[in-house]
A protein has these predicted regions:
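Transmembrane alpha-helices and immediately adjacent membrane-cytoplasm interface residues
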Residues: 73-80, 88-111
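Non-transmembrane, membrane-adjacent beta-strand/coil modules in membrane-associated proteins
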Residues: 125-195
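N-terminal membrane-targeting/pre-transmembrane regions
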Residues: 1-82, 190-195
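Residues in well-ordered beta-strands of folded domains
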Residues: 77, 177, 199
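Conserved beta-hairpin
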Residues: 98-144
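Polybasic (Lys/Arg-rich)
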Residues: 193-195, 201-214
Length: 214
């Protein structure tokens, strides 16, 4: 099956800069919120819904980065401790980077996919949260797909249907076929899609839970 890239209007330089600034700010704020939710054990799972994680392929990588960043911060602080004007900015920058990585990790932990009486919540960290009502779902199937790194998040197949790919390590393993083309909100804007491909750490459990409602 061939796919094509969805064309989007080009932004001006100022529009692109504004978009990046807004997105960075929102990621920062959501990162702090994720840390708060993790510390106080308040995951975002709708009442009555079952949670399904998707962080396992990335967990070891993120933990290594966080540990190395922590060690690096301490070592650099010791090396430049005699020069306050250098030490303080580097320490602030190091702490900010460490907090950012923690927010990224905790964003996945406290915002899992959810399957419940009212539908499916498809998540990708703190940036993507797509509610799909059961009335909009035609089918939920297990389907493993390995996706090229260069392939965009939204593609259009030969049959004219747009597919959203929320991959982890270039892989998805669940397909949600929608009853009709449905608008979904993404970080770069709204896209209209007919299918959603996502990754779950336990695709069998996700599929079995979805079968209870479809």
């Amino acid at each position: 099956m061939t796919t094509t890239t969805v064309a989007r209007p080009r932004r001006t330089w100022w529009q692109f800069a504004g978009y990046l600034a807004k997105r960075a700010t929102m990621m920062e704020l959501r990162g702090y919120q994720s840390i708060y939710r993790f510390v106080f054990r308040r995951p975002r799972v709708p009442a009555g819904a079952a949670a399904f994680s998707y962080h396992q392929p990335l967990l070891a990588i993120l933990i290594v980065i966080i540990v190395v960043s922590t060690i690096e911060m301490v070592v650099v602080d010791v090396i430049v401790s005699r020069w306050t004007y250098v030490r303080v900015p580097l320490l602030v920058l190091s702490i900010w980077g460490l907090v950012y990585m923690l927010g990224l990790l905790f964003g996945m932990l406290v915002r899992p996919h959810a399957v419940g009486p009212h539908g499916i919540r498809v998540r990708s960290g703190s940036e993507v949260d797509i509610p799909i009502d059961w009335g909009d779902v035609q089918s939920v199937t297990r389907r493993k797909k390995v996706i090229s790194e260069k392939q965009p998040k939204v593609t259009v197949d030969a049959d004219g249907q747009a597919t959203l790919h929320l991959r982890i390590m270039n892989e998805t393993n669940i397909e949600v076929q929608l009853e009709r083309a449905t608008p979904v909100r993404l970080p770069h804007g709204t896209e209209t899609v007919s299918r959603v491909h996502l990754y779950a750490d336990d695709p069998a459990a996700f599929h079995n839970e979805a079968r209870r409602y479809t």
